[in-house]
Amino acid sequence: ILKISDNKKIIYDVKCSAAVKETILKSGGEAIEWKTGHSLIKNKMKLEKSDFGGEMSGHIFFADRYYGYDDAVYVSLRLIEILSETDLTLSEIVSDIPSYFSTPELRFECKNDQEKFNVMKDLKEYFEKEYTCSTIDGIKVFIGKGWGLLRASNTQPAIVCRIEGESQVELDSIKKIIFSKLSTYKDIKIEF
């Protein structure tokens, strides 16, 4: 996309690995992190006139020669097209993408939506005192060589969490900080 499009903006959601941003920038693109949710990504793509976007969930959107919505068959065909234009294998193409250590998406149930939003407000105040944070969607806390994301679920009374580090040691360290704070909320079920 970056080779053929005049618009270099690529939209991706807050749950994506730091490798996404790094790869976009290395390839000459403009990385725009946005809120999680396929409709939110699509709307941001329209606003930015972006030809490509994606989410950690696997929703991938092409808008350069297509309608700008997620379509697995179309994405597969575009991948086949890319592979047909090179002598490299898919493994060789993606071999330069950095690899990080991360948790799967974790969900911590709250009693109700009100508690979910109260906890998120408190988490934001707590972490912003100590760390650099992004509040695009929830709170993304940058700790050492990684980050922890805490956000209110769009569909349930739950806090959604994802953590990433450059190494297993970094990941474990960030998990300890995030989980230590989450454990102070007596009504949140923390199971991991």
Could you say what each language-model-derived stretch is?
Residues 1-4:
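Cysteine protease catalytic core and zymogen-processing segment of caspase-like enzymes
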Residues 6-192:
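Phosphate-binding and adjacent anionic-ligand microenvironments
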